[in-house]
Amino acid sequence: PDLPEIRETLLPPMRIAKPVGWGDSVPQAPQGFTVTALATGLNIPRQMLVLPNGDVLVAEGRGGGAPRLRPKDVIAGFIKKQGNTKVESGNRLTLLRDANGDGVADVRTVFLDSLNAPYGLAFVDGYIYIAEQDALVRVPYVEGQTQASAEPEEVTKLPSALNHHWTKALTASADGSTLYVGIGSNSNVGERGMAVEEERAVVWAIDRETGARRTLARGIRN
């Protein structure tokens, strides 16, 4: 294809799409399927976890907070903000239960509040594990409960300085003994220097009981 010549501009010649919700519309499903909103009005839903009894946990939150140290950061921040939602971060886990099977949640409760940008979720051996932007924590869970019965217990801290790519993905090994956490890079192309990339762009393998960890993979951007 014919590509335009490179141009240097103070402001990029681009249009940012205005963030809007679905409204009364729904995604178009293949023939024989329908799409129903299980719940609406969530505060920046990120990841979901289906619990053993079919209840659904939703992590709601927004993190980040890389400092604006250069003129470029101020300009880029202004442009990116145009595409951000105005919805406030939930910083919580919301539990949804569809008791009658009609596809709409009949029960909706705040399962756990006052979290720090929760993202990854996993359920292993009676505990719900939550990857916040700065720590891996857990709370005990008994099937059927709609609110956490204890304060989060820290398993291990997670790298969070600057936090350009803040989301922390989480999954468990088949036997449940190891938790894997994805830790994003602190830049796009190393523009902040390599010192801030220490223990970033990696996957950690974390012992579920002791919190001991090792680096499983490196060079993974986000």
Name the predicted role of every residue range.
Residues P1-N222:
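Beta-propeller domains with acidic blade repeats across secreted/periplasmic ectodomains
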